[in-house]
């Protein structure tokens, strides 16, 4: 007969009317009983022939590919002008006096952050934007490009200009040296065989023209021929007559990439161009355009009249080095959905490429990417804005993976000890926290994102495309890209992006200037940064509490008025460091702080309400007597494990689930086990703050007996049969708690001290978790343990009770370091003649 829930409760000693603990509890350690109960509850039957269930409620397997939902109306979030002050250490010193060793070390880690992977794998540009949304290929392409452009404009990305240089927007740091102190000079690198052309200064162009062709069109490097540079590109000009092109003069040399793959070297003079690209190099290269007057890079429109057409090459002949987008302007429409209808909508499509305000030298950067990007909803509650997901998982895989630095995170008890108080709370939101921390330019070649341009992207994804290879594109296959879908998508996108459609249709390669989210180093750096800042704030305001976990920062003060003045002071300090806060997301919590998924008050800690509701909903949908895929069980354990410390039996209750996941077998919930778990999670108990105190109760055990010292009283008992020593010590601790009611017990066993009961026999672990809930343990060496003699059957000998003080720990977290005392910026001692003097001690 299967075990009923009531019998099971009684067995676990969860009911009040259980028998004497000294008899009942050792029985739960019996292997035979544990095995019989597991069979009755159908917990041990891992091999099942019925098909597995792969979905329970919203839970599917951890690694199942749930397709994210695309929103054509996503808005790209705006990024403030984030610039963390370079002299952050000096500013902190002005604020709080000398910094501690820990604070100094952490702040130096991120000024600038460095990233040196063992091996970097370079991927073709086609893999730059992941085809996550096959239904919305073009829309996703442009939204992602717009997002990347926004990040570049906000100074978060570098743009690769050539193999050895990059440009960026925003304020430069001292380690980002402009080329030749502001003179933008292309270095000739003999080692890699780069032939380069040098404009003389940042705003003024050279007067002499360079000749009919620029050799740097084909940069030969170790990677073989680099992709074509886009600046000399032109579109075929049929008839003569005046053309109007908006020329954007610029000091830049060769740009990142044009559609990759390069054919033979093209003679620039022989391919005529009316798509006059906006580059000073191009202007210098074409002797047809007068260059006697230098132009600043402000982008004035220039009228160019009577540009002679070159009739030496017919429209369909040979490769044309050109801008794919503007080539459509002069071509005949191939259908009503031809892209030339869109290209002819406006006269001025703006520049083919934009350049940043500053230019720096970088290590050699190939025209490739190292990770793909795609867009998703910003978060489950905000589906109107998009978030960029960057996949740099190559650094976490394989034999060459980077082992990321570990950092301590407070566990639940440490967090409760620290934050469970009668303070009034407020939480701050750091906007785009990761993008505050600057990366050294040497890391740029390892963290590249980008795209191969619209033509390649569409060609690669359209199955019927005949563009086999970009380097052999001719005017006939220019129209291979034209399709109804592309036309409709571009028409709709034209309303949103206007002339930027042209800019975004070009290839681009971008490297990270601030730390990206997709690299394992970033959470570590962010945790170090915010913990150092909080440490400084705590020392500046010793009567308050500041604490952070990643980008979540909380402030606590005794009263609401006090908290408001603290908020004003801390906000001003953070803004002076260049940290951007989101004032709309500042939340005032009163006396119950919501933090890291918990509600923390003076009474202790509980899970937040939305998690409790999620658990209840999941139990309603949980099927019984049906094998559930172990990957779904991983999700279940993730949810239940978060709330386990608040239940009677804690983690040990979930051990059967852990076992099935380890065995990679399906798990079947019996009605009794489901009822047991449901009841466990319906009544949650807060985890209380541990209090300091003097230990008066001690427990000890041998495999055959146990002994207690409760004040001056000594007790002992024996086990029916010898038990493993850890099990015996756990039983002794349980007896000490039930006999004395003390919340502080001294023991010499490290396993009991750890309060992890998952390695004990299942039934004993569940029962012990409930008996010892809220108990704190103090380590006492065996030689000094007053319960040592009683456990060995010697009651006559009295060892004196130790004065064992217990201090609750806030954990070894890098996020909360009790700062060693340092001289503050105010004098420590008050002069003895002062009216404030209480008791003067000689210096």
UniProtKB/Swiss-Prot annotation:
Site (Priming of reverse-transcription by covalently linking the first nucleotide of the (-)DNA): 63
Database matches in Pfam families: DNA_pol_viral_C, DNA_pol_viral_N, RVT_1
Residues engaged in binding Mg(2+): 429, 551-552
Key word Amino-acid biosynthesis present: no
Single biological process term from Gene Ontology: symbiont-mediated suppression of host innate immune response
MF terms (GO), sorted A to Z: DNA binding; DNA-directed DNA polymerase activity; metal ion binding; RNA-directed DNA polymerase activity; RNA-DNA hybrid ribonuclease activity
Assigned keywords, A-Z: DNA replication, DNA-binding, DNA-directed DNA polymerase, Endonuclease, Host-virus interaction, Hydrolase, Inhibition of host innate immune response by virus, Inhibition of host RLR pathway by virus, Magnesium, Metal-binding, Multifunctional enzyme, Nuclease, Nucleotidyltransferase, RNA-directed DNA polymerase, Transferase, Viral immunoevasion
Domains (record comment): Terminal protein domain (TP) is hepadnavirus-specific. Spacer domain is highly variable and separates the TP and RT domains. Polymerase/reverse-transcriptase domain (RT) and ribonuclease H domain (RH) are similar to retrovirus reverse transcriptase/RNase H. The polymerase/reverse transcriptase (RT) and ribonuclease H (RH) domains are structured in five subdomains: finger, palm, thumb, connection and RNase H. Within the palm subdomain, the 'primer grip' region is thought to be involved in the positioning of the primer terminus for accommodating the incoming nucleotide. The RH domain stabilizes the association of RT with primer-template.
Stated family: Belongs to the hepadnaviridae P protein family.
Role played: Multifunctional enzyme that converts the viral RNA genome into dsDNA in viral cytoplasmic capsids. This enzyme displays a DNA polymerase activity that can copy either DNA or RNA templates, and a ribonuclease H (RNase H) activity that cleaves the RNA strand of RNA-DNA heteroduplexes in a partially processive 3'- to 5'-endonucleasic mode. Neo-synthesized pregenomic RNA (pgRNA) are encapsidated together with the P protein, and reverse-transcribed inside the nucleocapsid.
Name of the molecule in the record: Protein P
